[in-house]
Amino acid sequence: MPLPIFPSRLQCSSSSSSSSSRSSFFRPKLRIDPSLTLIPGLSNDVGRLILSFVPYPHISRIKSTCKSWYAFLSSKTLISLRHSRDNSNTNNLSHLLCIFPQDPSISPPFLFDPVTLSWRSLPLMPCNPHVYGLCNFVAVALGPYVYVLGGSAFDTRSYPLDVPLPTSSVFRYSFVKSVWERLSPMMSPRGSFACAAMPGSCGRIIVAGGGSRHTLFGAAGSRMSSVEMYDVEKDEWRVMNELPRFRAGCVGFLVENEKEKEKEEEGREFWVMGGYGGSRTVSGILPVDEYYKDAVVMDLRVDGGEKWRVVGDMWGEEERPKLGKIVAVDCGKPVFFMLDKDWILRYEMGLNRWRKESSVPKKAHYDKPVGFVALNGELHVMILLDGYNLMDTRHTRQQRKAGSLMIHMYDPKKKTWRSVVSKPPFNHQLDFRTTVMCTIRL
């Protein structure tokens, strides 16, 4: 006896089969129901605030918890919320190190968290097909952005081809949009210059000095004394009073005057330390730089009355030939520290002298380059343990993988040291002589 036929069931079956066939050919983009809450029992506003306190390097790990978390943690709202929840206190943000091992247009930069020892790569910077070998650029952070300014590179359109030229290009990486942006170039091309970011309601960046020297050459290159200031909102550069003399290879810091700290712009000073100006020759053949032992300071004022004052020599004739690597730490007020071989020196501003603060607990092999940065109020001495030799050629170093990274951390308030070891994710050697680093809070 034949089975009865039910049209409704056939219709349902056919519709389901056609639906499945359509879904196999057309895969619409997954949409998340906006009515779903991030955390059950709490409003989305509260849930977003709670998730915004997660340390930045851990965000990629918790994205896969659920669809709503993935949508929020991948959105532009996250970074904006982390920076806007308390503008007066940035200690709640993760203090990270941004490392540029090589030319950022051919080798990606990385973010490093010294607390969790986690690494995260960033996209490549836009490439110019005519320019290669960018080095001696400056990276500085301002808000949720990292700026890459200037540098020295080779240009295939110039002659002779083996002469490096300074560049005036400026790029900015936005952690909100996760993209690189090209900004207005500097008025004067420069590399190896002093630079400092001025946070506030109207963010600004100031640059001073510089030249055209490339890392492939130990001497030669131009020097300059020009000073410029960049307005972030207007995307414009303006000329400021020049340095008292030519100065390249220098470093810059922003210092706030405690008496006028409530005045956003007027209580600031721009310090430019070290560097070199003229040169001399040994036996009439070998060029040798003449390094400066002093510093110059500019008082930054709204009325445009910027003036430079010269600070005398910071050390004697027989102490050291040139300034070492310098960082600034906020110990209630900015304090300068310098790494001089295996010693940490503190700058006594009243005496205008560098005094010994502490020694690195484990002596580094000083035939290797050493990194020196300030993070979370601590000094970080970064030493590559293995896989590096100064006698290796440039090609050989690029073929080898990076070794382990020993980081000695010094707390200036507690006068204590601690050490950690991390494995960098680079597929090439890390050379601290040419590596560019800056810190950022996210």
Swiss-Prot record:
Domain F-box residues, every copy? 37-84
Keywords recorded for this protein, A-Z: Kelch repeat, Repeat
Each Kelch repeat occupies one of these ranges, namely 93-139, 145-200, 204-257, 269-328, 330-377, 390-437
Pfam families xrefs: F-box, Kelch_1
**InterPro entries under this entry?**
F-box-like_dom_sf, F-box_dom, Kelch-typ_b-propeller, Kelch_1
In which domain of life is the source organism classified? Answer: Eukaryota
Which protein is depicted?
Answer: F-box/kelch-repeat protein OR23
Annotated source species: Arabidopsis thaliana (Mouse-ear cress)
Lineage here is: Eukaryota, Viridiplantae, Streptophyta, Embryophyta, Tracheophyta
